[in-house]
Amino acid sequence: MSDLFSFNKEKKTKIINNTYSAKDIEVLEGLEPVRKRPGMYIGGTDLNAMHHLVSEVLDNSMDEAVAGFASIITIKMHQDHSITISDNGRGIPIDNHPKFPNKSALEVILTTLHSGGKFSSNVYQTAGGLHGVGVSVVNALAEHLEIKVYKQGKLYKQSYAKGEKLTELICEEAPKRLKGTSINFIPDPEIFGDKIHFNPKKVYELARSKAYLYRGVTIEWECEIEASSDVPKKALINFPNGLKDYLSSKITPDDLITTEIFSGNVESEQDGIKLEWAICWQNNDSSAFIQSYCNTVPTPLGGTHEQGLKSALLRGLKAYGEMVGNKKTANLAIEDILETASVVLSIFIAEPTFQGQTKEKLVSQGVSKPAENIIKDHFDHFLSSNKTIANNLLEHFIAIAEFRLNKKNEKTISRKNATQKLRLPGKLADCTRTSPEGTELFIVEGDSAGGSAKQARNRETQAVLPLWGKVLNVASSTLEKIVNNQAIQDLEIALACGSMKNYKKENLRYEKIIIMTDADVDGAHIASLLMTFFFLRMPKLVEDGHLYLAKPPLYRLTQSNKTYYANDEEEKAKLTDKLSKSSKAKIEVGRFKGLGEMMPMQLKETTMHPEKRSLLKVTLEDFQNVDKIVDDLMGKKPEKRFQFIYEQALVKMDKIINELDI
């Protein structure tokens, strides 16, 4: 027993250093800190982090455009997986820097953290840039980077590798009409690995979003890489109506409550802000979202500009309700107004202040009130000029508010005596552990499967919720249908975390939510409906990694009193072949018609025991792409569903033909 912890002791001794002196202090110079800890600068080394590099370079070109010095930005994706981003702006300065007389300003910008023109209000009134660290981070994390600057009939160019200078600044003659900056780079596989590359669809959508945010810029797009059908080889991207064009491309007109988008574009010299917005309301909340930006940089956590917009909408609607004598508007809250709203908001200000390194939330003071006043003035006019629209909106919001207030009056759910308080038709069998850590909720269909699962579970950590009634397709249902559906009510009450904008992850009662359906086609259909529900109603739950799919077996094979399980036809064939070769004994094959047919011990051993089961984790990597697929496959329009199935069938057929040995 005395040796039981010897390994840990030895390990601990190695870690402790009693001679802590100056030599233990590691000093990283130049761009070394970026290469050593890339996550501190771009948030990681995954695919999303890699695309931050594109954002940084593109934001620099956008700063030139917003400042009025550039009108055209070019993005070209090359076959070698490098990317070139160019603009026709002023071009990065190439004269020697006052603090570094032996270096050009270009070299200083590329090799020094926190350098660049955007820190001076004399150069840019408004500026973006992802982390304020400049193109130097891109240079540090690029396997190769080449920069070209066109100025006054000259071409200046320089090459770098992994942040280190390869060549001196070279000057050549060039046509006088050419001006601006061009950067070509490829991410370093030492940092990001050699299996991920820039995603054309992701970069194309980024380019489109930037063009929407500043209507004065045209982006020339070219892609040499094979991409999905919705990514063109070449395109000119320009949106003269800005965010209104963007919102129009995101919504389905048939679902709108209002026939008109509430939009505006105002520049206030007095307040020092430029504000643009576009808002519409739909019949259900499945497509609701808020996207906000400051100086073309996304602010997913909102901030003071969003606060101003929300106050303007709430004040405007309450004022209109009071004007028309509708007393029920007094109960309105901002969550009622935003429940089914699709909102895009963009603000340009000088010297913005953000929370955190990644600029995800705007915290600049003096922004909220001007934004509120500007938007409210326009909203008041919008409502008073469109009485029919205004009254429809008011009725819609009041209905949502009444539903919210009714739910608020329900008793708080506790684990103790949960079945009585929840009053679930399926009789939730809850676990005894009071904290969410290590707990699991198995969602099954019907009482038969629920009975087997309840007997097979670990009562301390595993809960079982059998859903009764038809699982609703929330992608094609109205908000009224969704909130009145029994299965959805049961599920939302059991999870207790709320949905859509009312989702609170700290209230989620289980660590893992596991969809456990039959292993056949019917089970897959139910699982797809439930996944659609979670994606549209609780996307944050999916993003945070709480949603899983169980993998129950479809077949049971018995040979010589030994039992084996197979998940599908292919696995059954392989297992049969293997057993036939190892023994001549007869193989008996049985097919489970459903989970309810399985004995509790079988269900436990194959599907529910944490150490013996297989789970599929449901993840969200490309939200916009998933959103489109869900809309095509699960939405209201059958022609979209037919087109999706047809395209997938063609892909499958091509694969089969390619695999045929003819």
Swiss-Prot record:
HAMAP family: ParE_type1 (MF_00938). PANTHER family: DNA GYRASE SUBUNIT B, MITOCHONDRIAL (PTHR45866:SF1), DNA GYRASE/TOPOISOMERASE SUBUNIT B (PTHR45866). ATP binds at residues 20, 60, 87, 129-135, 359. Mg(2+) 1 binds at residues 445, 518. Topoisomerase IV is essential for chromosome segregation. It relaxes supercoiled DNA. Performs the decatenation events required during the replication of a circular DNA molecule. Belongs to the type II topoisomerase family. ParE type 1 subfamily. InterPro entries: DNA_gyrase_B_C, HATPase_C_sf, Ribosomal_Su5_D2-typ_SF, Ribsml_uS5_D2-typ_fold_subgr, Topo_IIA, Topo_IIA-like_dom_sf, Topo_IIA_B, Topo_IIA_B_C. One of its GO terms (cellular component) is chromosome. PROSITE patterns: TOPOISOMERASE_II (PS00177), TOPRIM (PS50880). This is DNA topoisomerase 4 subunit B. Heterotetramer composed of ParC and ParE. The record marks 470, 473, 525, 641 as: Interaction with DNA. It comes from Rickettsia bellii (strain RML369-C). Binds two Mg(2+) per subunit. The magnesium ions form salt bridges with both the protein and the DNA. Can also accept other divalent metal cations, such as Mn(2+) or Ca(2+). Its cofactor is Mg(2+); Mn(2+); Ca(2+). The lineage of its organism: Bacteria, Pseudomonadati, Pseudomonadota, Alphaproteobacteria, Rickettsiales. The keyword Isomerase applies. It catalyses: ATP-dependent breakage, passage and rejoining of double-stranded DNA.
